């Protein structure tokens, strides 16, 4: 599965020697999509694919840090994912909880700053609490900036931004002209 998720420029195992240095992007964004279909194509349950994808996120973070990539964004759960079968949503939330338990260790090891974007209000309280804890604990880290998009969708983001702007206009905080 590693080759399935590994971008071509990460295939080189080492760039420690000066003559092997390569140009790397400053920011990589990854949409965690297709893990369920991948598992199904292998005769495994969809949740197995989601779990394998989550395991690879830690590897990707370490590789990005090692290569000097400054920003990594992972689209982990979109607003559209709520329409999946409830047992799959529950499994994804369990996976998120488990990942967040180990995420702090990975962040400390790789000097990662963790930030979560998206509408976290519908998430369970324990997940929201863990998000706040991770963001606060890693706020001063200077290595890889790791952004996790949870309950995120571009339409939803634009809708929330437009509503906030309208409220700010009504409150007199912003001039509509």
Task: Walk through the language-model features, giving the residues of each.
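Flexible, compositionally biased loop and terminal segments
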Residues: 4-177
């Amino acid at each position: 599965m590693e080759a399935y998720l590994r971008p071509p420029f990460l295939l080189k195992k080492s760039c420690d020697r000066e003559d092997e240095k390569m140009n790397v992007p400053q920011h990589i964004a990854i949409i965690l999509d297709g893990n369920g279909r991948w598992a199904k194509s292998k005769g495994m349950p969809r949740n197995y694919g989601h779990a394998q994808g989550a395991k690879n996120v830690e590897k990707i973070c370490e590789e990005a840090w090692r290569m000097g990539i400054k920003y990594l964004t992972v689209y982990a759960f979109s607003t559209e994912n709520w329409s999946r079968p409830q047992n799959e949503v529950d499994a994804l939330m369990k996976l998120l909880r488990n990942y967040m338990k180990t995420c702090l260790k990975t962040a400390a090891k790789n000097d990662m700053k963790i930030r979560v974007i998206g509408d976290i209000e519908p998430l369970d309280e324990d997940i929201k609490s863990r998000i706040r804890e991770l963001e606060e604990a890693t706020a001063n880290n200077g290595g890889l900036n790791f952004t996790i998009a949870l309950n995120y969708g571009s339409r939803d983001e634009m809708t929330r931004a437009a509503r906030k702007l309208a409220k700010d206009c009504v409150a007199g905080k912003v001039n509509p002209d």
